[in-house]
């Protein structure tokens, strides 16, 4: 296995680039829970600090960063509502980035998957797993505070509508949304580019300002991620 040569801070807070002796590069985050990985990712020790390799084929946020995301609104101390947290791959890296003074509320609909997320959260006190249906944000309104960032990764035909509805409940004015658009979950017959355009129009008609649209290929085929700001 290749060995790490250097670890450098990227232009995004708490996100690093690991260079290996074979000339390859990987994203990584500083491990909040030293000695433990989450999804089989490599742990990297460098100058007395442990980092976790961030696999862009397993995490759409990592893919977006490698595909040129200009700014990451998730930083140290950020409060995040994550819809579609699944078993905890991406939200665990969010946990590393926001550190202990941040909070990551993870909504997941599947009881089986939430059990896996709970295991991750047991070691990460800044992750708050919620077994809930993202279509009904009122069901978790009593436990989720207003957040700085809404991250949405759900496979529903009305995923953008669900995101907008949650934003009205929880996203601060001038807060940011990272919306994963899964073209094949919306319409298998249309060109993905047409779908991305239509979903962005929905956002802009609901007081969101589009900042950037990123096609996630080759990390995720027929997926895009949209960074937008909520004007309230």
Swiss-Prot record:
Q: CDD domains, from UniProt? A: AdoMet_MTases
Q: Which Gene Ontology BP terms does the record give? A: box C/D sno(s)RNA 3'-end processing; tRNA processing
What Gene3D superfamilies is this protein classified in? Phosphorylase Kinase, domain 1 (3.30.200.20), Vaccinia Virus protein VP39 (3.40.50.150)
- Name the SMART domains for this protein: Fibrillarin
* InterPro entries for this protein: Fibrillarin, Fibrillarin_CS, SAM-dependent_MTases_sf
Record key words, sorted: Methyltransferase, RNA-binding, rRNA processing, Transferase, tRNA processing
| Gene Ontology molecular-function annotations | histone H2AQ104 methyltransferase activity; RNA binding; rRNA methyltransferase activity
Pfam families, per this entry? Fibrillarin
Share what the entry says about its subunit structure, partners included: Interacts with nop5. Component of box C/D small ribonucleoprotein (sRNP) particles that contain rpl7ae, FlpA and nop5, plus a guide RNA.
Role, per record: Involved in pre-rRNA and tRNA processing. Utilizes the methyl donor S-adenosyl-L-methionine to catalyze the site-specific 2'-hydroxyl methylation of ribose moieties in rRNA and tRNA. Site specificity is provided by a guide RNA that base pairs with the substrate. Methylation occurs at a characteristic distance from the sequence involved in base pairing with the guide RNA.
The entry assigns this protein to a family as follows: Belongs to the methyltransferase superfamily. Fibrillarin family.
Q: Which NCBIfam families match?
A: PRK04266.1-1, PRK04266.1-2, PRK04266.1-3
Q: Can you name this protein?
A: Fibrillarin-like rRNA/tRNA 2'-O-methyltransferase
What organism does the UniProt record list as the source?
Saccharolobus islandicus (strain L.S.2.15 / Lassen #1)
Report which gene this protein is encoded by.
flpA
């Amino acid at each position: 296995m290749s060995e790490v040569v250097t670890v450098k801070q990227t232009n995004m807070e708490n996100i690093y680039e690991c260079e290996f002796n074979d000339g390859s590069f990987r994203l990584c985050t500083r491990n909040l829970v030293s000695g433990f990985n989450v999804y089989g990712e490599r742990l990297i020790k460098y100058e007395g600090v442990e980092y976790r390799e961030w696999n862009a084929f397993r995490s759409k946020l990592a893919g977006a960063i490698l595909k040129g995301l200009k700014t990451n609104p998730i930083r140290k101390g950020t409060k995040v509502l994550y819809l579609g947290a699944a078993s905890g791959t991406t939200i665990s890296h969010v946990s590393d980035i926001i550190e202990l003074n941040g909070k990551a509320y993870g909504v997941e609909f599947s009881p089986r998957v939430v059990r896996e997320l709970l295991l991750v959260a047991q070691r990460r006190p800044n992750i708050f797993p919620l077994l809930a249906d993202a279509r009904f944000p009122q069901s978790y309104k009593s436990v989720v505070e207003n957040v700085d960032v809404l991250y949405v990764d759900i496979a529903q035909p009305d995923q953008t509508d669900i995101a907008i509805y949650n934003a009205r409940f929880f996203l601060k004015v001038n807060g940011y949304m990272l919306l994963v658009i899964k073209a094949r979950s919306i319409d298998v017959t249309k060109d993905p580019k047409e779908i991305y355009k239509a979903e962005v129009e929905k956002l802009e008609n609901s007081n969101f300002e589009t900042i950037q649209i990123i096609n996630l290929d080759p990390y995720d085929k027929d997926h895009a991620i949209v960074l937008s700001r909520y004007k309230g």
